[in-house]
């Protein structure tokens, strides 16, 4: 086969140009050209020519659209590059709407005779198609397949007498007239208004030689490209596929048909070519709506076990592409039903229960299953490229603090590089914290002054290894996003740092520090090995004393003080911090020191009570920050006077539950104290470890231990009865106001047996309040105001019963005497109060020892009976 073009192709171009020149009075407008053969296309040219008249009345030879047919011979000369769209500005003119499809379809494959080949040549109204045509003129067709503004290639046919110039979108381009001999002579052109000028922003075709081996590659390339927007008139044919193959220049000559043109930077620029049209081919990116997920499988929408995220992903895909599925609407509805079932946890009724299984029924509905984690088609290749780049990229090592001695010590640090790379996995023990001390500066300030600390301690961290260790140490103790996770244990390990003047022998110290991974033993000048932590080597070497760690017995959280284990007597270094009993004066309250919550002032404080090593441990004492005083004793007060105006039953509230907290000091002072008028609503027994100064205390001078309550101790006279109930009436306002009474009744045995009522004398708060009272004492209003309980108040069952019987008998006599002498409810016949004992008869049998029925005739008798009943139980 010959590489020269067919003769019919050359004649076609000549004949077309000659017919153009003959129709000077009637400028032509080429609309479309579809030719099954060359002769038919030439004969039909006259039918397609139309006259176009400018707005100023002159006829112009300009063309709005020109299509040149190219007949292909036996070999493929040209291949399709692009179908370029027409700009939006073309649609603003009415005369453009009638134009046919502006496209260029040139394919390297063989076509039938009915194929259409056309190209759109854009230009303006005031520009000429013909300009200075010569015999050796070329046909420059400037294209840019790489989507740039430069004109790269030039294609010429040497036997044509036509030159195509594409003008920029500016007015004033040269126009010319076409003569009969086929030559064009330039002529002046008037400026046309912008409204009368039409600019066609379309691109010219790109031609390149195509080999037989490249046809399949070109075809595959066309199928893989993405469509972009096209002209409104050409909805069906506007999609173009830019080729990825490089374009070349073609020139026809007598010897060789293909001749590459010179590059743009080597060719001299013609002044007539400078206003060439700069085409900007905009490549639009893929829209988010075009992103599709790859459905890997098909599942039954009616019986599949769905996840909520998969339901949303599948439903979104179905709503966009339901037209592509036969059951798209059913799949969409099934997605909604599945989502409602999953959200509200509904149950599914089997078809068998509804007799739904028939021959024509289909109980399945298959559709695409998509997951939210599936990669999309649009980004799948990009993710693969990023993964490859990450795998190929070298790993960047973190920068560490460099000093001036790094290069000098490079040879020395190379041997210990393996040790520096080893991560610090062991957490710092309490022993290390005690020896090295805690960084009292908060972590933000440490980061702020890290550079200053590094300069001041340059001798310690003099190389890269030390800096790495230090950074790793701080990063472990103080993470960037610190969220403390505290795990509590039943037992807490305790230890204490002890300062000693001299260390033991080398063998003992070496065996003592075998389990300390971070401790080092270094010989000193005196031959004594010093045991220190590596991070604290400088500080320990400067100090003259030495520190050792002593283990304390494990403390159990929330445990009583008596249950703590005693320290082993065979301790290696008991020191001055341990008492005779082996118990240390370390705070006995169980405390947990976390890694970041450790404070040295909590380990040993001078103001605590462990200065004297000969003090014995007293389990009945509670130690405070200061010396234990009488103010720190426990006080139990009856602030509400519960036994005066309420019906209380404290059978279950035995005083023995308070005995372990009571004070059993036998030699305490028994001074009298008074209460203020302050009101406190609390339980009958209020416990105060530090009573407020305004709350006084009360006590009884005579304890039931030293005085016996007998019936003979009380007199049946009316004066005695009146004195008792006068006190009762006096204290009644305080009872109603729920305030502690001011007065205290002392039961004293006198020669005549009369009870004397004396007010309490106020005393200082520092006085003792360890006086004791028995719950079996006489039930008066003031006896139970405030008491202090201790183990000495424990009574046996026989003693309590005897005291109770004596109190009952005494109460009966008191009530009888009161009813005989001062009964406010008894009156005589005249209506005046009567003191006659015959007016009120008291049944003696109702008040015997075995009777427990209260006397209902008087409220005072009921009160006494209920109080006695509660004490008796």
From Swiss-Prot:
One Pfam family hit: GATA_AreA
Q: Where is the composition biased (Basic and acidic residues)?
A: 211-225, 743-755
Family annotation (InterPro entries): AreA_GATA (IPR013860), Glucose_repression_reg (IPR052292)
Q: Where is the composition biased (Low complexity)?
A: 665-686, 758-773
Q: Which residue spans adopt a coiled-coil conformation according to this UniProt entry?
A: none
Subcellular location, record wording: Cytoplasm; Vacuole membrane
Compositional bias (Polar residues): 698-740, 823-855
Q: What is its main location?
A: cytoplasm
Sorted UniProt keywords = Cytoplasm, Membrane, Vacuole
| Keyword Membrane in record | yes
Region feature (Disordered): 1-24, 175-251, 375-423, 506-540, 568-592, 662-773, 822-855
Q: Name one GO molecular function term.
A: protein phosphatase regulator activity
Name assigned to this protein = Uncharacterized protein C227.15
Keyword Metal-binding on entry: no
Question: Where in the sequence does UniProt note compositional bias of the Basic residues kind?
Answer: 376-385, 574-586
Q: Which organism is it from?
A: Schizosaccharomyces pombe (strain 972 / ATCC 24843)
GO CC terms on record?
Answer: cytoplasm; cytosol; fungal-type vacuole membrane; protein phosphatase type 1 complex
Query: Tell me, which GO biological process terms does this entry list?
Result: cellular response to glucose starvation; protein catabolic process in the vacuole; regulation of carbohydrate metabolic process; signaling
Q: Which PANTHER family match?
A: PROTEIN MTL1-RELATED
């Amino acid at each position: 086969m010959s590489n020269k073009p067919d003769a019919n192709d050359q004649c076609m171009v000549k004949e077309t140009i000659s017919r153009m020149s003959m129709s000077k009075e009637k400028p032509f407008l080429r609309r479309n050209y579809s030719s099954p053969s060359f002769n038919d296309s030439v004969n039909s040219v006259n039918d397609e020519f139309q006259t176009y008249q400018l707005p100023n009345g002159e006829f112009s030879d300009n063309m709005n659209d020109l299509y040149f047919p190219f007949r292909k011979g036996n070999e493929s000369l040209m291949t399709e590059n692009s179908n370029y769209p027409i700009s939006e500005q073309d649609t603003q003119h009415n005369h453009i709407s009638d134009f046919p499809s502006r496209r260029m379809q040139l394919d390297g494959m063989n076509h039938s005779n009915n194929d259409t080949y056309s190209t759109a040549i854009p230009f303006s109204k005031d520009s000429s198609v013909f300009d200075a045509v010569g015999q050796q003129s070329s046909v420059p067709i400037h294209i840019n397949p790489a989507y740039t503004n430069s004109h790269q290639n030039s294609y010429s046919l040497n036997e044509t007498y036509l030159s195509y110039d594409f003008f920029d979108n500016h007015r004033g381009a040269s126009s010319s007239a076409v003569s009969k001999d086929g030559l064009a002579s330039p002529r002046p052109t008037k400026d046309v208004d912008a409204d009368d000028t039409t600019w066609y922003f379309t691109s010219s075709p790109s031609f390149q030689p195509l080999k037989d081996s490249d046809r399949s590659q070109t075809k595959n390339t066309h199928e893989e490209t993405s469509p972009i927007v096209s002209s409104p008139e050409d909805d069906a044919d506007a999609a173009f596929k830019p080729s990825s193959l490089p374009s070349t220049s073609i020139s026809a000559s007598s010897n060789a048909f293909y001749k590459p043109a010179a590059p743009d930077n080597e060719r001299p620029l013609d002044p007539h070519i400078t206003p060439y049209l700069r085409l900007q081919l905009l490549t639009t990116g893929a829209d988010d709506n075009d992103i599709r997920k790859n459905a890997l499988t098909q599942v039954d929408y009616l019986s599949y076990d769905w996840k909520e995220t998969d339901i949303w992903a599948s439903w979104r895909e179905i709503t966009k592409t339901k037209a592509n599925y036969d059951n798209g609407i059913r799949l969409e509805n099934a997605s909604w039903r599945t989502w409602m079932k999953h959200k509200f946890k509904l149950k599914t009724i089997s078809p068998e229960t509804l007799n739904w299984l028939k021959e024509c029924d289909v109980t399945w509905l298959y559709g695409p299953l998509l997951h939210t984690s599936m990669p999309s088609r649009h980004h799948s290749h990009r993710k693969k490229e990023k993964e490859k780049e990450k795998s190929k990229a070298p790993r960047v090592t973190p920068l560490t603090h460099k000093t001036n001695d790094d290069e000098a010590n490079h040879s020395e640090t190379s041997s210990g590089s393996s040790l520096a790379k080893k991560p610090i996995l062991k957490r710092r023990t309490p022993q290390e914290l005690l020896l090295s001390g805690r960084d009292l500066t908060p972590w933000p300030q440490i980061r702020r002054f890290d550079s200053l600390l590094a300069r001041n301690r340059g001798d310690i961290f003099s190389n890269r290894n030390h800096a790495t260790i230090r950074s790793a140490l701080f990063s472990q103790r103080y993470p960037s996003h610190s969220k403390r996770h505290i795990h509590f244990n039943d037992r807490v390990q305790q230890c204490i740092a002890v300062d000693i003047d001299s260390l033991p022998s080398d063998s003992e110290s070496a065996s003592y520090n075998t389990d300390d991974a971070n401790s080092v033993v270094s010989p000193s000048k005196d031959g004594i090995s010093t045991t220190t932590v590596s991070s604290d080597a400088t500080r320990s070497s400067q100090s003259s004393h030495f520190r050792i760690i002593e283990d304390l017995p494990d403390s159990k959280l929330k445990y009583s003080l008596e249950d703590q284990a005693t320290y082993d007597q065979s301790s290696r270094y008991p020191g001055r911090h341990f008492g005779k009993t082996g118990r240390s004066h370390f705070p006995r309250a169980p405390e947990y020191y976390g890694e970041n919550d450790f404070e040295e002032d909590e380990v040993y404080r001078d103001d605590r009570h462990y200065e004297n090593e000969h003090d014995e441990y007293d389990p009945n004492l509670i130690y405070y920050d200061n010396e234990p005083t009488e103010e720190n004793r426990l006080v139990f007060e009856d602030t509400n006077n519960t036994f005066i105006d309420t019906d209380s039953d404290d059978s279950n509230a035995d005083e023995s539950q308070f005995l372990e907290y009571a004070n059993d000091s036998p030699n305490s002072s028994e001074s009298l104290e008074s209460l203020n008028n302050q009101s406190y609503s609390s339980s009958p027994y209020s416990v105060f470890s530090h009573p407020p100064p305004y709350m006084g205390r009360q006590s009884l001078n005579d304890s039931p231990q030293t005085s016996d309550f007998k019936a003979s101790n009380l007199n049946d006279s009316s004066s005695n009865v009146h004195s008792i109930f006068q006190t009762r009436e006096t204290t009644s306002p305080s009872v109603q106001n729920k305030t502690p009474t001011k007065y205290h009744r002392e039961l004293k045995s006198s020669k005549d047996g009369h009870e004397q009522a004396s007010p309490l004398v106020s005393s200082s708060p520092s006085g003792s309040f360890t006086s004791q009272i028995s719950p079996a004492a006489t039930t008066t209003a003031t006896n139970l105001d405030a008491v202090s309980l201790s183990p000495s108040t424990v009574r046996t069952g026989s003693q309590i019963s005897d005291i109770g019987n004596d109190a009952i008998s005494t109460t009966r006599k008191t009530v009888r005497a009161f009813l005989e002498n001062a009964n406010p409810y008894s009156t005589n016949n005249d209506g005046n109060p009567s003191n006659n004992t015959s007016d009120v008869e008291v049944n003696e049998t109702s008040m015997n020892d075995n009777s427990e029925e209260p006397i209902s005739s008087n409220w005072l008798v009921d009160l006494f009976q209920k109080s006695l009943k509660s004490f008796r139980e």
